[in-house]
Amino acid sequence: MEYVTGVSKKETVEISEILSGDFEGKQVKVNGAVHTIRDMGEVAFVILRKREGLLQCVFEEGKTKFDLKELKEASTIEVEGTVRAEHRAPNGFEVRLDTIRVLSEPAEQLPFAISKWKLPTTLETNLDHRAIVLRNVRERAKFRIQEGVVRGFRDFLYSEGFTEIHTPKIGAKSAEGGANLFRLEYFHRPAVLQQSPQFYKQMMVGVFDRVFETAPVFRAEKHNTKRHLNEYTSLDFEMGYIDGFEDIMAMETGFLQYTMKLLERDYAKELKMLGVTLPNVEQIPAVRFDEAKQKVAEKYHRQIRNPYDLEPEEEALIGQYYKEECGADFVFVTHYPSKKRPFYAMDDPTDPTYTLSFDLLYHGLEITTGGQRIHDYQMLLDKIEKRGMTTEGMEQYLAVFKYGMPPHGGLGIGLERLTMKLVGEDNVRETTLFPRDLSRLEP
């Protein structure tokens, strides 16, 4: 009988091990994909692409046991050779090849050269060939940084006593309501794809006090803009026993501070590759919704057209205002009108036309919505009745409050929007692995 005893050490080495200098002058075995081949005659540079980056391998006619003409870009190979320090090589080390063994070959030539620094293709072409485009090191770097954001979110919240949860994405009713729902038949019963894990987050506050989730959400909005997707990844948390909605803003600020340090430490290569300057998150200004509108109207001579919500242009100008006034990259806009917030949002007791809620703007783009929730059962019922809503389909949710809930609140962060602003892109599809929008269901 054979037994599996865990992960065994491989014969092959990784780029990080080579760059440590410990293997200089030693024989190594490395595998990877052929990113590009630069044939100089008797010498050729075979650039291997691995998860950690690129590695320069040197093919020498008469010394390397392989016919270079047989090697194709995008082949996966295993090579053996000697590690040498070389200041002209990327990262200062290269492998002088003795042998090359082909593991697999492409059936066709790549549709375009992915080894170029910036691909000479349109966004639509990039999305049509998404899996190939993502092999480009610059494209790949965006999603390494996105990984860092999610790592930061998880690690920081774990350190603050949060429990990670996983909630259903198919339900009978959506927390946000409205008409922007993807509807489907669920074994002969009507169902919807969830716009938010809001109901479940609140339910679980009664169980774990502090919870978070990173998961997809679905919005059937017929927008065709650079900032909207119909499926995106939401970084959500909900926390109980708060003193006010300011606790939620403080927790998000802490997450951003932790994450920027993490990116600086563990993703310096990707940040440098993309020319990213990390934002200032030492302190984030907060301004009331109505005051923000007034400030922008006065400074930029703009008429207030919609008193109940922020238009995209207003968000951009608020970001510009606080960048000019105090060098801020982020700004919290607080106390949104009750009319524009969901029924579960806590109204401001000093003025119920406003809520104890907020959005976080990053360079003038909304990336977060959050606030304090109603935790009193009767208050929830009164708000539902006042809005002319029905409790049908919400019985399980309301039962949580019937049997006691602490003061609580939370937020949702759009991962793709946050990444877009971090890496300096202007279209959210650029920072989505496989975007879903009005026209795209593939790949």
Which residue ranges define each predicted feature?
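Generic, well-ordered alpha-helical scaffold segments in large soluble proteins
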Residues: 148, 152-160, 196-206, 210, ...
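Class II aminoacyl-tRNA synthetase-like tRNA-binding/catalytic domains
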Residues: 2-240
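Metal-assisted phosphate- and nucleotidyl-transfer catalytic regions
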Residues: 176, 254-360, 386-399, 403-404
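Short alpha-helix boundary/capping motifs
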Residues: 146-147, 312, 374
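Short, solvent-exposed positions on alpha-helices
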Residues: 91, 160-163, 246-250, 392
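Extended, domain-scale alpha-helical bundle/helix-rich regions
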Residues: 240-248, 253, 293
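Extended, non-catalytic structural segments that build the interaction scaffolds
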Residues: 141-145, 276-281, 368
